[in-house]
Amino acid sequence: MKKLLMNQKLVITVFSVLIVGLALFALVPMVVALVMGPGVRTEPVNAENAEPATTEANGEWTVAQGRPPNTSSVGFTFDEVLPGERTRTSGSTQDVSGAVTVEEGALTAGEIVVDLTNIVTDRDVRDENVRNKLLETHDYPEATFEITEPADLSEVPDDGTLGEVELTGELTIKGNTEEVVQPFQVLRDGELIIVSGDVVIDRNEYGVESPEMIAADIADEGEINIRVALSKGGQE
């Protein structure tokens, strides 16, 4: 009789473990859905409704809000990797500041500062992971891009169509600085200059590590998505 009772307890225990295991397995897609998704991407410059330039290029330009769809925004795009599945996700912020100098048709100096503490995706849980675990914004609240070599702007059209300019600068994330040499699209739209580009980076070079306690691994290579509106008044 005692042996029979022990066997019954064993069966009940195993059955209970199976139920719990199945329940946890069923929850995995729900957890993944909470932290994964396309995110909020900083899209490239849109020249569809751009107007001819109304302001001389030479002078001091400051980061402005811009006009939809070309508002100032900086963000990231990375792949998230799960067993048998790879999805792309993005985050962005419109908390961008800075200034550049144009002299004799050349961009001679400039720095763009991005407030990372307000970066958002499309999931609150992932927002917290990005800010606190990936970017550690409590210690590194800002990222910067500083121009280190002059760039010729003389070939940028002033008729509201896109031009391309190669910019050389230093990108700093989490206190780690790497040189960037990157072609950017440049648009003169009325009183604004819009600068846009996707900078490919290896997150490991900037000390951005994938935490263990998140639902998906993060690909090493991704993009920093940049779209910055500049004006001489800084108000538009």
Model-assigned labels for residue ranges:
Residues 2-236:
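Low-complexity, acidic/polar, glycine-enriched regions of mature
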